[in-house]
């Protein structure tokens, strides 16, 4: 007892209708993504996408000695070089509405996220101020939360900021 050709044809038509419904539903859920602006910081003094391209084309090496402005003794390190962001401490806290004390207690990852997000919008020709109050999502991944533990004992006006400044969960809030 087989299936009649008519029933098979109707089952195939029903499956095609379901596939079409699914395709339309998926199409509504999928929005195109366009990268319209970029920014970056890499070891070797790379501070923009254009500089990164030049760096790669020239085949340069980003390995250098450790920066002296970090919370470590370069002579005591077990390595003589690495890929370091030498300008990580350069930050304009007033531009981002932060006090000097808050900036000092903030993980460099948070400061870089603020700077690079702003630069990415500028690179795209978008005024970051125009996004205030808009339906814009902020997503960021932050790893290695060891900055607070590496800080020497902070000045008296910094402790209140120390924990928020080193929490990865606060990074997107600063940006938003």
What are these regions (language model features)?
Residues 4, 8-14, 18-21, 25:
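Heptad-repeat coiled-coil/leucine-zipper oligomerization helices
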Residues 25-176:
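Cys-dependent condensing catalytic cores that perform Claisen condensation/acyl-transfer
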């Amino acid at each position: 007892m087989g299936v009649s050709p008519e029933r098979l044809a109707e089952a195939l038509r029903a499956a095609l209708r379901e596939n079409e419904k699914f395709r339309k539903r998926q199409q509504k859920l999928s929005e195109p993504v366009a990268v319209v602006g970029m920014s970056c910081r890499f070891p070797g003094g790379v501070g923009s996408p254009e500089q990164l391209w030049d760096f790669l084309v020239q085949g340069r090496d980003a390995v250098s000695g450790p920066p002296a402005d970090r919370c470590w003794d370069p002579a005591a390190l077990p390595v003589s070089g690495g890929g370091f962001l030498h300008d990580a401490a350069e930050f304009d806290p007033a531009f981002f509405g932060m006090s000097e004390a808050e900036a000092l207690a903030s993980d460099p990852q948070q400061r870089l996220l603020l700077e690079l997000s702003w630069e990415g919008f500028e690179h795209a020709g978008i005024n970051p101020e125009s996004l205030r109050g808009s339906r814009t999502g902020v997503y960021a991944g932050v790893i290695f939360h060891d900055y607070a533990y590496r800080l020497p004992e902070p000045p008296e006006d910094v402790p209140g900021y120390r924990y928020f400044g080193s929490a990865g969960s606060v990074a997107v809030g600063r940006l938003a």
